[in-house]
Amino acid sequence: GLGSVLGKILKMGANLLGGAPKQ
């Protein structure tokens, strides 16, 4: 669903910024 898509975007954004996914 939409939440899953947003979660993926947030994870990718964190990875691009060099931050480890917090989940």
UniProtKB/Swiss-Prot annotation:
Name the Gene Ontology biological process terms.
defense response
Q: In which tissues is it expressed?
A: Expressed by the skin glands.
Q: Which UniProt keywords apply?
A: Amphibian defense peptide, Antimicrobial, Secreted
Disulfide bridge map: none
Provide the function of this protein. Answer: Antimicrobial peptide.
Q: Which family does it belong to?
A: Belongs to the gastrin/cholecystokinin family.
What this protein is called in its record is: Caerulein precursor fragment R6
Q: What is the lineage of its organism?
A: Eukaryota, Metazoa, Chordata, Craniata, Vertebrata
